Structures are given as C-alpha cells and as structure tokens.
C-alpha cells in the first residue's frame, strides 16, 4: 500500500511541479516577488498532496521574526528546499550553482537572485557567497543555508557530514543573528527515496544565536543546537510510531 501511495504522490508531485514551472514562465518578466509567490504555491500544493496521498502532516514549532537574518537549517529531504517559501520572509536560499543549470527551474532561481555557490571554486566561492548574502541582507531578506551542505539521513552523526565553513563566513562577515532550525523530514521523505512514509514532519525554530560570537564558539553552538534538537525530534517520531 505504501508503494502505491508513494507512486501516486510522485506522479502528482512531478506533474504539479512541471505545471507550475510552465505556468510561471510569464512571471520571469515580472518582479522577483512574483516568483516567490509561485514557490509558496508549490510548497502548499506539495504539502496538500503529501497529506492526501501519503498521510504526511507538517507541524511547525515557533516562527521567524521579521527582518534580515541567517537561518541555518538541518537538511534531510527535498521537501526542505521548498518549505521556507512558506516559513521565511522573502527567502534567499543558498544553493549549489549546478541547480541553476536545471531547465526552467534555474531561470526561476536566477530571477529570484538566490545565492549560488560554486563548490569547486574554493576561496573565491566564499567571497562571492558573502557578497551575494550582503546584497540579500540589504534587501531585508532572510537567508536560508543548510550548513552541512547536503541532505543527511536521520540518525547520521554530524561527523559523517561536517558543518561547512560557509555559515561561519557569513556570520563573521555579516554579523547577523542566526536562527537554527531542527527537523525530521527525512523520516518520511528520505534522500532520493521513492517511498514516502506516513507520519508527522516537525520543523522547529530554535533559540537565536547572537551575532557577536567568535567563529569557533558560533560553530559549536550552532551544531550542538541543531543536532540535539534534531535527535529529539527523531526520538519523538519513533515513540509516536510505537505507541
């Protein structure tokens, strides 16, 4: 039954995505925020499909305050890349440059001035990251970054996917408050997984980390905050499944 429901969702999801991409093409001539509205609609429709076809529900704990800030989120699922269209204010995602090469999707990312990172460029990539993020801050946008740089499986230790220097470079250069985010989305929608499992996905906004910390202390607090809260959410899901 799970396989059938997953197949139905995957078909509906890709159809929904393609429909929005094509319907949104004329908006490339409009202002950037029009594309943001398409992203929010994409996320809402996907959540509706997940609930109706798979039995996956979303719970959000806390919220982001308005204004420019860094948002450092755990990354376990493709779903994470659309949720912040709903949860952040005028989101600017930090994403790998290769995504801009995806037909149509890449045009949307460029039009929204997402922050693209060439992971092969070394120090020059960090400089560009800081410059682009500084421009986003000047527009009052909320910058969402996945500090481990990739999707990680639930339960994986942070040492298997270390926290990358990009978030520390942004914190040091921009001196912005950082909101850590824990989540357990990989339990229901894992990386490159055809199967989607019913359950409750929780996204939790954690206490803000102040801007004035030194790099080492900032990274320690960020990793400790995200990892401990994510482990707690995964335990909660396991307890709920057994009850």
Language model feature labels by segment:
Residues 1-70:
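Membrane-anchoring hydrophobic helices of lipid-metabolizing enzymes
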Residues 60, 71, 93-94, 203-205:
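Generic preference for hydrophobic
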Residues 21-39, 51-53, 69-122:
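Catalytic core of membrane glycerolipid acyltransferases/transacylases, capturing the structured
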Residues 48, 82, 168-169:
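Active-site phosphate/pyrophosphate- and oxyanion-stabilizing loops and adjacent acidic/basic residues
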Residues 126-243:
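Non-catalytic C-terminal accessory region of glycerolipid acyltransferases
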Residues 66-74, 140-146:
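Pre-Walker A (Motif I) flank of P-loop NTPase domains
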Residues 63-64, 122, 184:
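Residue-level "edge-of-site" marker
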Residues 63, 108-109, 170:
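Structural alpha-helical scaffold elements that stabilize or flank donor/cofactor-binding regions
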């Amino acid at each position: 039954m799970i396989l059938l429901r997953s197949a139905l969702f995957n078909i509906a999801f890709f159809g929904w995505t393609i429909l929005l991409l094509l319907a949104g093409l004329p908006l490339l001539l409009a202002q950037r925020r029009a594309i943001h509205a398409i992203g929010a609609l994409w996320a809402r429709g996907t959540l509706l499909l997940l609930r109706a076809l798979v039995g996956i529900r979303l719970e959000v704990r806390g919220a982001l305050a308005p204004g420019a800030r860094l948002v450092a989120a755990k990354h376990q699922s493709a779903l994470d890349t659309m949720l912040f269209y709903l949860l952040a204010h005028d989101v600017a995602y930090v994403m790998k440059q290769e995504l801009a090469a995806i037909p149509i999707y890449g045009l949307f990312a460029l039009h929204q001035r997402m922050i693209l990172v060439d992971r092969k460029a070394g120090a020059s990539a960090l400089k560009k990251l800081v410059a682009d993020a500084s421009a986003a801050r000047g527009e009052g946008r909320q910058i969402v970054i996945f500090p481990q740089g990739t999707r990680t499986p639930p339960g994986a230790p942070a040492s298997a996917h270390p926290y990358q220097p990009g978030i520390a470079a942004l914190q040091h250069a921009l001196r912005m408050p950082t909101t850590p985010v824990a989540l357990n989305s990989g339990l229901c929608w894992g990386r490159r997984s055809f199967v989607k499992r019913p359950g409750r996905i929780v996204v939790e906004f954690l206490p803000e980390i102040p801007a004035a910390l030194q790099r080492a202390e900032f990274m320690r607090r960020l990793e400790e905050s995200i990892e401990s809260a994510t482990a707690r959410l995964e335990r909660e899901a396991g307890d709920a499944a057994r009850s």
